[in-house]
UniProtKB/Swiss-Prot annotation:
ATP binds at A58, V59, T60, G61, S62, G63, K64, T65. One of its GO terms (cellular component) is preribosome, large subunit precursor. A motif (Q motif) lies at residues 14-42. The lineage of its organism: Eukaryota, Fungi, Dikarya, Ascomycota, Pezizomycotina. Residues 283-437 form the Helicase C-terminal domain. It catalyses: ATP + H2O = ADP + phosphate + H(+). A motif (DEAD box) lies at residues 197-200. Its main location: nucleus. This is ATP-dependent rRNA helicase spb4. ATP-binding RNA helicase involved in the biogenesis of 60S ribosomal subunits. Binds 90S pre-ribosomal particles and dissociates from pre-60S ribosomal particles after processing of 27SB pre-rRNA. Required for the normal formation of 18S rRNA through the processing of pre-rRNAs at sites A0, A1 and A2, and the normal formation of 25S and 5.8S rRNAs through the processing of pre-rRNAs at sites C1 and C2. Its EC number is 3.6.4.13. Belongs to the DEAD box helicase family. DDX55/SPB4 subfamily. Gene3D superfamilies: P-loop containing nucleotide triphosphate hydrolases. The gene is spb4. It comes from Aspergillus clavatus (strain ATCC 1007 / CBS 513.65 / DSM 816 / NCTC 3887 / NRRL 1 / QM 1276 / 107).
Amino acid sequence: MAPNPPKGTSSRAWDAVTPPLSEWVLEAMSSMGFARMTPVQASAIPLFMAHKDVVVEAVTGSGKTLSFLLPIVEKLLRLEEPIKKHHIGAIIISPTRELASQIHSVMQSLLAFHPPSAAAMTPLDDDDAPRQKFPSSTLKVVPQLLLGGSTTPAEDLSRFLKLSPNVLVSTPGRLLELLSSPHVHCPQSSFEMLVLDEADRLLDLGFKETLQNILRRLPKQRRTGLFSASVSEAVDQIVRVGLRNPVKIMVKVKGTSGVDDKRTPASLQMTYLSTPPLHKFAALKNILSSVQPTPQKSIFFVSTCSGVDYLSAILPLLLGDDFLLIPLHGKHQANVRQKNFNRFLSSHSPAILLTTDVASRGLDIPSVDLVVQIDPPSDPKTFIHRCGRAGRAGRRGLSVVMLHPGREEDYVSFLDVRKTPVVPFSPSISFSDADATSATARARKAVLADRALHDRGQKAFVSWLRSYSKHQASSIFRVADLDWEALGKAWGLLKLPKMPELRSFTGDKTLGVSLDWDNFSYKDKQREKRRKELLQEAAESGVSQPSSNKRRASESVAWSQNAENKNKKLQRREYKKLKQEKTKWENMTEEERQKARETKEMVEELRAKNLEERRFRQAAAKAETAKAGGEDEEFKGFD
C-alpha cells in the first residue's frame, strides 16, 4: 500500500484538496497506489468540485480520468437526498468502446471502497452473491456502461430499468438511443455533471450531430467538463457545447531548456528511424532487439485496417517466436476487438499490439514500453496520441516513427515546429541487403502457400497507398517519390496491384516473380473449387480469366440467383432467432416473462415515439423546402 504524504506538506496531496475529499476516497487513492495528485488532477479537481465548468488540456497519460471521476462521485454523494429512480445525475461520453469500458472499470474500482455503491453494483443475475442492505435514503453512485455492438438498445433499456443507475458511461450513439426513451429522465432537478472525454475527437464531424442531439436532451444548468490531450484544436466548437464561462486548464511539460515546449510526458523518449523502403519491416526486429530490457508490451501502428489484416500474418514470420503479435482494428466485430484487447493486456510474455488509430486515443494500457509508428499518421495531430500510449503516469517509454530517407525526413522539422521534438533512434541500426532479401523471401513463402493471403496483400497495399496519398503534410509525403519495387518486395508481394498511380510506372511490375497464376491456389477448398470453375468457364467461353476479387466473382452469378440466396439466408437467420427466443421464453419464470412483456412494450413505445418524431422532422423539412421554393416557376423542360 502506498503511504499517504503528511497532511499539508504538498499542494498535490490528496488531503489538501479544497473542498476536501471524503475519507473513503483518500483511502481508495492510497490503496490504489496514487500517493499524490498529478498536476492536472491538482488543477482540475478543486475547480470541478467547486461548480466550475472546465476545459482541460493535458498530455496523454497525465491522469485526466480521475480528474473527472472524483468530482462526479463526490458531487452525487453530497446531495441532500438520493436521485429519483430512473433519473440521471451524471453522464460521461467517450468516443470509443474501449475507452468507455476503461472509464467504467476505473469507476467500479473506485466505488468498491464505498460500501453502499459497491452493494448496488452487485450483478443483477448473481442471486448467490451476498448483498449488504442499506436504507433507501442512503446516497450511492450506480454507473451503467452503454456500448454499441455488445448489447442491443432494448437490453440496455431493460438493464437501466432494473438497475436504475445515476451515472451513464457511454459512446455517443448508444447514449442518444437510451436518452430517447420516455423512461429515462434528465431533469434539471437531478442532472448535475456532463463530461466529454477526448473532447476534440468527440467534436469531429462524425460525432457532431449526435452530440448536439444529446445536449438538447440535457438541462442547460449543469456543470460541464471537456478533457483531452489537444483541446485547443477544437476551441471554435467548444461554445456550441454549452459551457458557461469555463476555466481553461493547460498542463504542459518542461523541455530541457526549461520552457514549456513539449506536449508529451517527460518520461517518454520520442525518436525517429530513417530506413530504406526495402528494409522497413526487417528493421522492426532490430528495433526490438536493441531496446533493453526487452519490451514486454509494444504497440505497432499502421495506417489501415487492411494493413493490420495482412501484416498480422507476415510480421510473425519476420519477428520470430519471441513476441506474441495481436491484431486490433475498428472493423473487427466488437467481441473480437474486446477479446484481442484483453489478450494483449493479460499476456505474460512479450506482446505486440498491431493496430490502427483506434488504439491511439484514451486507452489506458498499463506498462507499454515501446510504440513504433510503422506508418506516420495522416493527421499530424494523431502523432502525440500514438506516442502517448507509452510513458504513461511517469513510467519510462520509447516511441519510434519510421521514415524513408530523403524528403520524409523533413517530418522531423515539421514535428519540431509543432512542439513535438523527436531525436534519432539510438543505438544506431545497420541495414543489410541480405536481411531485407531474407525477410522478403519468408514473406513470399507464406503468400505462395495461400492465394487468399496474396489477395489480402494486394488489398492492403492499395489501401496503404490511398492513406499515404491523403497525408495532410502532402509536401513531405509525396506519392511521386515512392520506390514502388522496393515497397512491393518489402511487403512480400508477388506483383504490384493495378492502380492509377502506376500507369506511368515503367519498372518491373512482376517484382521479379515468375508464377503460373492459373495453378496458384487457395487453401480453402470451397474457394479454390469456385476459382477453378470460373477458370474453366473462362476457357470455354474464350474470355480471359476473371479477377479473383469479390466484385468480379459476384458479376458471374445471375442477379436472380443472388437475390434468392440472400432471401434464403435471411429466412434461416429469422428462423434461428425465433427458435432462440422460444427456448429462452420456455426457460423463464412467470415473473421474468412479465418483465419481458413490460420491456417489449416500452421498446415498442419508444420506437413509435422515435418514428413520430422522425416523421414530424421530415414534414417540417418538407414544408420549409416548399416555402423556400414557393416563388420558383415550375420547370417546363428543354425546348
